[in-house]
Curated annotation (Swiss-Prot):
Name of protein: Cytochrome b
Membrane topology: Multi-pass membrane protein
GO molecular function term, any single one: metal ion binding
Residues given in the record as heme b b566 binding sites: 97, 196
Gene3D superfamilies: Cytochrome Bc1 Complex, Chain C (1.20.810.10)
Encoding gene (name): MT-CYB
Binding site for a ubiquinone: 201
Lineage of producing organism: Eukaryota, Metazoa, Chordata, Craniata, Vertebrata
GO biological process: mitochondrial electron transport, ubiquinol to cytochrome c
Length: 379
């Protein structure tokens, strides 16, 4: 008799995705981040659910309801900080996951790559709206500044912003709808992640060499289940160190001041994981130009497969491309630093140079480097 695992309609799906899945024998720890992102998502949904049981999405009580969660709810403080820092861990995993895809040429699976880009946008939208919910100073002003960017869209901009706000400023209606969207989006992300995985399993995983590995596959369980569990334990260790030792390390002190529309904080800045995009936005003096650059800084990922000029898929054996890749990483770290600095000299100039370098690397230098490498190998 065949094992129920292989015959039952539901068990069969799980079996083919997590147990008997043929996986390349040489995938490194950089392939752990998919499962870690799944772990983060489940953690965020669970902690978020428990927070939603005690949170009130009303401008008069939102701030105090978060304080109530931290002070009066049993283990409310740990749930709140796991949720806040869980978002940071989520984005660390996301950036590493995307970076892995760029380095090893995983973008050559277009469906998987494109659903991944949609997932990235959905996650960024969710995180932004979540940051507004505690209704501190940075929540309020962050929401005001970022939503106001849409007013740069010609003709419909102003109407669009007022439609999103539900009034003439960020107020009760805005907070209520942001809470509703923040609650529903993770479930949409979960559905998109399932589609992402479905597309991945159509082609099978890529591997560090970028060479098809059909001739050398091993079962996912036990080899990669144990590897994923180790990854999850390390993720949990990092998260709990953040939560228990320095829960406010990545937050903004201004968010411990209740939202006040009459008092603007000296430096309005988003959470650390948006700073690179914020720096690109600020480096262009024109409002519409800045908004376009902001969107394109992420949307540029969609044309990466079209810019692939190399005869090899992975960067593993391409030293010139490797140098440019790590230059891109350094550039993104520079942009992240600049995004957190006030908009004054010399930070403005550094931000502009880093923004130019970011787009130049992806659109011009990396494709040229690939062509040079092809010629060096006489291909």
């Amino acid at each position: 008799m065949t094992n129920i695992r292989k015959t039952h309609p539901l068990a069969k799906i799980i079996n083919n995705s997590l147990i008997d899945l043929p996986a390349p024998s040489n995938i490194s720890a950089w392939w752990n981040f998919g499962s870690l992102l799944g772990t983060c998502l489940i953690l965020q949904i669970l902690t978020g659910l428990f927070l939603a049981m005690h949170y009130t999405s009303d401008t008069t009580t939102a701030f105090s309801s978060v304080a109530h969660i931290c002070r009066d709810v049993n283990y409310g403080w740990i749930i709140r900080y796991m949720h806040a820092n869980g978002a940071s861990m989520f984005f660390i995993c996301l950036f590493l996951h995307v970076g892995r895809g760029l380095y090893y040429g995983s973008y050559m699976f277009p469906e998987t790559w494109n659903t991944g880009i949609i997932l990235l946008f959905a996650t960024m939208a969710t995180a932004f709206m979540g940051y507004v919910l505690p209704w501190g100073q940075m929540s309020f002003w962050g929401a005001t500044v970022i939503t106001n960017l849409l007013s740069a869209i010609p003709y419909i901009g102003t109407s669009l912003v007022e439609w999103i706000w539900g009034g003439f400023s960020v107020d009760k209606a805005t907070l209520t709808r942001f809470f509703a969207f923040h609650f529903i989006l993770p479930f949409i992300i979960l559905a998109l992640a399932t589609i992402h995985l479905l597309f991945l399993h159509e082609t099978g995983s890529n591997n560090p060499s970028g060479i098809p590995s059909n001739s050398d596959k091993i079962p996912f369980h036990p080899y990669y289940t144990i590897k994923d569990i180790l990854g999850a334990l390390l993720l949990a260790l990092m998260l709990m160190m953040l939560v228990l030792f320095s829960p406010d390390l990545l937050g903004d002190p201004d968010n411990y001041t209740p939202a006040n529309p009459l008092n603007t904080p000296p430096h309005i800045k988003p959470e650390w994981y948006f700073l690179f995009a914020y720096a690109i936005l600020r480096s262009i003096p024109n409002k519409l130009g800045g908004v376009l650059a902001l969107v394109l800084s992420i949307l540029i990922l969609a044309i990466i497969p079209l810019l692939h000029t190399s005869k090899q898929r992975s960067m593993m054996f391409r030293p010139l491309s490797q140098c440019l890749f790590w230059l891109l990483v350094a550039d993104l770290l520079t942009l992240t630093w600049i995004g957190g600095q006030p908009a004054e000299h010399p930070f403005i100039t550094i931000g502009q140079l880093a923004s130019i370098l970011y787009f130049t690397l992806l659109l011009i230098l990396m494709p040229i480097a690939s062509i040079i490498e092809n010629n060096l190998l006489k291909w």
